[in-house]
Amino acid sequence: MLQGFVQIALILAILVATAPLLGRYMARVFLGQSTWLDKIARPLESLIFAGSGITKHPSMGATQYVSAALISNLVMGVFVFLILMFQGSLPLNPTGLAAPSWDLALHTAISFVTNTNQQHYSGETTYTYFSQAGALGFLMFTSAATGIAVAIAFIRGLTGQAIGNFYQDLVLSITRILLPISLVGAILLLVAGVPETLAGPAQVTTLEGATQWIARGPVAHFEIIKELGENGGGFFGINSAHPFENPNNFANLLETVIMMVIPAGLIITYGIMAGNPEQGWLIFWMVFILYGILIAIAAVGEFQGNPLINQILGETQPNLEGKEVRFGWVLTALWAVSTTGTMCGAVNGMHDSLMPPGGFVTLSDLFLQIIWGGQGTGTAYLFVFLILTVFLTGLMVGRTPEFLGRKIEKREIVLASLILLIHPIAILIPTAITLAFPDTLAGISNPGFHGISQVAYEYASAAANNGSGFEGLADNTLWWNLSASFSLIAGRYVPIVALIFLADGMARKQPVPETSGTLHTDTTLFTGITAGAIIILGALTFLPILVLGPVAEAFNLV
């Protein structure tokens, strides 16, 4: 067990060392300061702006920004949907795959354009190289960049600046952050043994003399943006448990760190852009501590194993069901907490096989959305909790709620409440409908408490733009594809609209002079209260489904 926690500590140390560096770099990019990439990136950006007709307008209003984000995402989603439906007539199709069903193609396009990558299919048998590496890979960059752009706009608004130009932020997110890191990361994955080829499946002869076809493809460049952009959709059906996506411990370490580095770095970016690095670090350590607690719960649960099996064996054995031997229980538990905390959604083991503590932790991550949170939007969610904490503490002590020198009033609280309420609506309502008709709709493989967790996880993953699954569901059906699409859209775009209008409203407010009665938000006490508010609000909202799922399952095993 000690060796396992040493492995965890090493990965966390690398994260703590790299996230601030990237955070400072991202702050320089979006503050318009010079960076070492200027000579390479500026000509490319000028070409993109000139070719697309985008002008470097100083800033957009909230309505313009929202319209630009929604319309561009709609166009990209429709474009990719059409590619998927006509993939049989397009190039790079060595296995002769035909088009999927319309509802699966629709769900896939919505899933990738929302940065979720929830997969009701197995990539190597459903989509061509062109569909995966071209169409879906394209959305992996643009959906991640959309999230970063929204986060930066939100940070600008909170700090009293104009929210900016969506198209400019989108392009900068790709050319200055996602592309450079992906290029280096893909080379490292190639060195680690991840394939990158347009050749068809390899024909091999097994030890028994039979002929077998082994799927391969342009995996390395797909894999790195999958993790970096917190996309999570695997080139192969078993995702990062597949040896061609995640062949060894070096690749696993790289992919684990890379999925967390942008959301963790954005917290530092906020502190710099707000002119208050101390507050950025306090928030960073708050999230880090919550993250560490959840890792400990999941890891200990996997180490203790299944009580029923341990009773038969007469000794305690770790839970190795659904895990790759090369990673073991500890790295699988760490990955599970990281991928659900960051809304990446990639998996290196079967979440359906996690013990109840692991199921509790992964569901809690999806419900809270702030450890470390989704690509950009998770950072914004974190500051929504800060705004609500300021409001609540202001009410308790009789002070006018203020955040970063601007009053928190009715409009801000209404928008913040909408952002937080749409999440349970997009999860609990479809979950209730599905469980009301389990035989006709659900396709649940595990009845009872675990079956409830499976259904809730599917919709929580969709609404949180995560994409991982407990699996065990027959989810490539009309019901699952359409109902999950509802959760995908509601969980992505309603919060984005509300976040932008909240930020724009804050930017337009006149700053309030600091007085002796001003509540300081850059203190350890306030940060602790914020952590408490996050846990309490999450517990009040989702405690019933957690009790009916993993908690009840844990008691059932005793």
From Swiss-Prot:
GO BP, one annotated term: potassium ion transmembrane transport
A cellular component term, taken from the record's GO annotations: plasma membrane
Keywords: Cell inner membrane, Cell membrane, Ion transport, Membrane, Potassium, Potassium transport, Transmembrane, Transmembrane helix, Transport
Principal subcellular localisation of the protein: membrane
Membrane topology, as annotated: Multi-pass membrane protein
Gene: kdpA
Molecular function (Gene Ontology), one example: potassium ion binding
Organism: Synechocystis sp. (strain ATCC 27184 / PCC 6803 / Kazusa)
Pfam family of the protein (one): KdpA
Protein's UniProt name: Potassium-transporting ATPase potassium-binding subunit
Family (UniProt): Belongs to the KdpA family.
Subunit note: The system is composed of three essential subunits: KdpA, KdpB and KdpC.
Keyword Membrane: yes
HAMAP family, alphabetized: KdpA
Functional note: Part of the high-affinity ATP-driven potassium transport (or Kdp) system, which catalyzes the hydrolysis of ATP coupled with the electrogenic transport of potassium into the cytoplasm. This subunit binds the periplasmic potassium ions and delivers the ions to the membrane domain of KdpB through an intramembrane tunnel.
Location of the protein in the cell: Cell inner membrane
Membrane-crossing residue ranges in chain numbering: 2-22, 66-86, 135-155, 177-197, 253-273, 280-300, 327-347, 354-374, 378-398, 413-433, 482-502, 528-548
InterPro entries membership: KdpA (IPR004623)
